[in-house]
Design a protein with these regions (language model features):
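Positively charged n-region of N-terminal signal peptides that target proteins for export
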Residues: 1-6
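N-terminal helix-cap/turn-to-beta initiation motif at the start of protein domains
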Residues: 23-34, 75, 128-136
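Tryptophan-anchored aromatic micro-motifs
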Residues: 32-47
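Short beta-strand segments that buttress and anchor functional surface loops
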Residues: 37-41, 81-88, 97, 107-113
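Short, surface-exposed coil-to-beta transition loops
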Residues: 90-95, 106, 117-121
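Edge beta-strand at a domain terminus
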Residues: 114-137
Length: 137
């Protein structure tokens, strides 16, 4: 039985690395939807960055939002999910996302970007659906 599980995990990891499996969406974020999100380092939403995302888990890699990254859910329970991501440019990060309401979440993120460490907390609020013709990130 252990050999079968090991083989399945090895095959799954290989296919995932090759981009043949779609990313699994965290259950903790299921009540939230993609769309326009205002993201700020301030709890009151001061000076937000507005991003259009297909799913909220993309906000886990906010520091690398314009990079090609792969995300792996490493913990997912209740209203909290932990996501590790690795980017093609060598950057990486780990984010703990907590769903406050279906339209509000926090992201505690840390990692390496441009060869330097980063660590900060983000507050994200869903503002609505993305407008037609605007690229999603």
């Amino acid at each position: 039985m252990r050999i079968g599980v090991r083989i399945a995990l090895t095959v799954s990891a290989g296919l995932s690395a090759a981009g043949l499996f779609a990313a699994v969406q965290p259950h903790a974020l299921a009540p939230a939807a993609g769309g326009w999100w205002d993201v700020s380092q301030s709890a009151n939403g001061h000076e937000p960055t507005r991003v259009c995302v297909p799913t909220p888990d993309v906000l886990a890699q906010f520091e690398h939002r314009n990079a090609r990254c792969t995300r792996v859910v490493i913990r997912d329970s209740g209203t909290t999910t932990e996501i590790h991501y690795t980017c093609a440019d060598g950057g990486f990060g780990r984010s703990v996302m907590t769903l406050v309401t279906p339209r509000s979440l926090t992201v505690d993120t840390q990692g390496i970007s441009g060869g330097l460490p980063f660590h900060y907390k983000l507050y994200a609020r869903r503002m609505g659906d993305c407008q037609a013709g605007i690229a999603r990130r």
